[in-house]
Amino acid sequence: MTYAWLALAGDAYAQSAATLRIESLAASCAGCHGTNGRAAAGSAMPRLAGMPRDRFAAQMRAFQENRRPATVMHQIAKGYDAEQIHELAAYFERQGP
């Protein structure tokens, strides 16, 4: 019985750690794009919340490859690997419009 409880606790901890990891990555976007990707009304920054994951990932790749004009996003995007971009894309898509 104890082992089953530990296994369940381990799964919950792993999910918790994964959730904290992605929320931490997403928090770095909040300064410009708003909390959870919800940019303020009238903001010049694009809203990330609800953005389709394929679009988000394509935009990040475009920044990484200097194919999209930007001021700081080239440097920011280059700080993420493909897995992190995939996780961020899924996170922001789940935030809904």
Outline where the language-model segments fall.
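C-terminal capping alpha-helices of c-type cytochrome domains
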Residues: R68, A77-P97
